[in-house]
């Protein structure tokens, strides 16, 4: 308990110095991450009142590396909550329970977010990459034999793939003979609706750029691999997609 209290004091002291640096010109609020806030986050009422008790339907969060994320704001039990897009922001920055997030209102519906580790230190490693594509790794076929199309592997999946799984993926990619890059991800609970959050799958910035996904919300058709080459209504499913600047979120309809 003593160690936890010490870390909290360091975190608060760091935030206090930052707020003093702002000279009271900007509105800020501090959130300490809990298990619940990893999936959705409640904005403090006092901060919401700064906006006349109402925050627009979407806001932009500027991460430490300068990338903007669009997050949906909803009302739940008289509370203002960040939901769709929030979990993707948390995952992209490897935010953990016990970390502290300092939100600074920049302009309109845009907020700068400072991420502090559980010991109260700013996570400076997040500032090193400003191109927004390190969350994914692009793999290609082995140098032996004819080169095949590349596939883009979710950063969450890369560390969990065995050598056999990687071999199977390469063989599958080669057999598909796609003219565009293929996206590969390991399914988890949030992808198949086993959590309290909406079912969704994040498609990263590199894949979105590689296949020219539009920067707007729209419906698309997903077709199972067995149905490739012909259209089968029973094997097609329409999904609603919400595009955000550096990620694509696939959300169950």
Swiss-Prot record:
Residues 230-239 have a biased composition (Basic and acidic residues). It is found in: Nucleus. GO terms for molecular function: DNA binding. Pfam families: B3 (PF02362). Residues 126-150, 230-253 are annotated as: Disordered. InterPro entries: B3_DNA-bd, DNA-bd_pseudobarrel_sf, REM16-like. GO terms for cellular component: nucleus. The keyword Transcription regulation applies. SMART domains: B3 (SM01019). Residues 26-119 bind DNA. The keyword DNA-binding applies. Keywords: DNA-binding, Nucleus, Transcription, Transcription regulation. PANTHER family: B3 DOMAIN-CONTAINING PROTEIN OS03G0619800, B3 DOMAIN-CONTAINING PROTEIN OS11G0197600-RELATED. This is Putative B3 domain-containing protein Os03g0619850. It comes from Oryza sativa subsp. japonica.
């Amino acid at each position: 308990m003593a160690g936890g209290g010490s870390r909290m004091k360091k975190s608060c002291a760091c935030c206090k110095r930052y707020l003093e640096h702002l000279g009271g010109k900007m509105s800020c609020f501090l959130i300490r991450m809990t298990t619940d806030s990893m999936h959705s986050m409640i904005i403090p009422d006092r901060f919401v009142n700064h906006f006349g008790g109402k925050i627009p339907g979407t806001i932009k969060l500027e991460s430490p590396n300068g990338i903007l994320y669009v997050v949906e704001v909803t009302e739940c039990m008289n509370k203002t909550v960040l939901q769709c897009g929030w979990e993707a922001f948390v995952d992209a920055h490897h935010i953990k329970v016990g970390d502290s997030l300092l939100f600074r209102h920049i302009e309109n519906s845009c907020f700068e977010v400072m991420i502090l580790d559980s010991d109260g230190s700013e996570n400076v490693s997040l500032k090193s990459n400003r191109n927004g594509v390190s969350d994914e790794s692009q793999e290609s076929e082995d140098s032996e034999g004819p080169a095949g199309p590349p596939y883009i592997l979710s950063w969450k999946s890369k560390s969990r793939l065995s050598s056999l799984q990687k071999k199977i993926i390469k063989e599958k990619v080669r057999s598909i003979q796609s003219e565009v890059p293929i996206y590969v991800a390991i399914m988890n609970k949030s992808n198949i609706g086993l959590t309290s959050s909406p079912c969704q799958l994040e498609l990263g910035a590199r894949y979105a750029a590689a296949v020219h996904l539009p920067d707007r919300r729209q419906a698309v058709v997903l077709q199972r691999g067995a149905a490739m080459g012909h259209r089968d209504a029973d094997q097609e499913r329409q999904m609603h997609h919400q595009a955000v600047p550096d990620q694509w979120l696939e959300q169950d309809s």
